[in-house]
From Swiss-Prot:
Its main location: nucleus. The keyword Cytoplasm does not apply. The gene is cenpo. Pfam families: CENP-O. It comes from Xenopus tropicalis (Western clawed frog). It is found in: Nucleus; Chromosome, Centromere. PANTHER family: CENTROMERE PROTEIN O, INNER KINETOCHORE SUBUNIT MAL2. Belongs to the CENP-O/MCM21 family. This is Centromere protein O. Keywords: Centromere, Chromosome, Coiled coil, Nucleus. One of its GO terms (biological process) is centromere complex assembly. GO terms for cellular component: kinetochore; nucleus.
Amino acid sequence: MEQAQSLFREGVLSHLEQLEALSYNLAVKQEKQRQEWAALRKNQELVLELRKKRDELKAKIERHKAEIQAFRGREEAGEDHGSAAGTSQQAMLELCVEELKGMLEMHWLTGISGKRTKKGVCVCISTAFEGAYLDSFHLDIALKPSVGISRHSVPPFIPLEQIAKEHLQTDLKKFLSVLFEHLNAYAGRKYQFQQLQSFPGGFVRDAQQGNSLHTVLTFGYNVRVEKQPFCLRAKLLYGGVTRSLPTEAVITCEDNRPSVQEKISSHSSLFCQNPLHRALECISSEDETLNHSSASLLGTHMF
């Protein structure tokens, strides 16, 4: 009898320790999420401020463009001759440089910065995702005798040559914007895959990237449905190389019962609407909450 009571007490204490551990882990995650939301709100305010500055710089660039067009118009009309024509060309070149400087300053607010060199400009494209600064890429763009890329650190699977062919000669601003979209989306997908690999092996396993662009990701993860453990397999497809979130999430499970399929459907939407690691954190928290509730009910029955 005494042995039974001792075992019972040990079971109760063990159960209480489990509840305490679950509560602590849940509190830590909630605090982490609160801090992340606070940082996100701060970043959103910063974005609004930077957009305002960007719009001011856009207006400044447009004024420079108008002045350049005015100089070109006077040249075509033959208003300037001899040394006056040389002065006009010099002034127009200076305005072009001012336009380029203003453009680079504007892009710096959105991840692109640059500095003048003897032959042109050196551009740095800095990528970020969810407030985390990621990789930076560099390009040396020559402006003389013609516009072209002399050196760069862009990965070979980014279609730099195609983007340059379409935009570099005619619209430098468009060229930088399109290239930034490609690089920033790639860095965001790569970052999410790295975050995926940081999850415990008991929750996420067999994480793999389908290609260098990280446009296909596969992994398995464990969940509980109706208090039973199941292993789900996920395949995330990014339909465009400028996307940071998947266009399709294919999730499979060997068990076809309705409750499992319902869980799969909700997870598919979650993966397509949120960064990968955020979606998995939500799934993990949901699973721990269910386990916590089940343990609490078990404790009630024990007493």
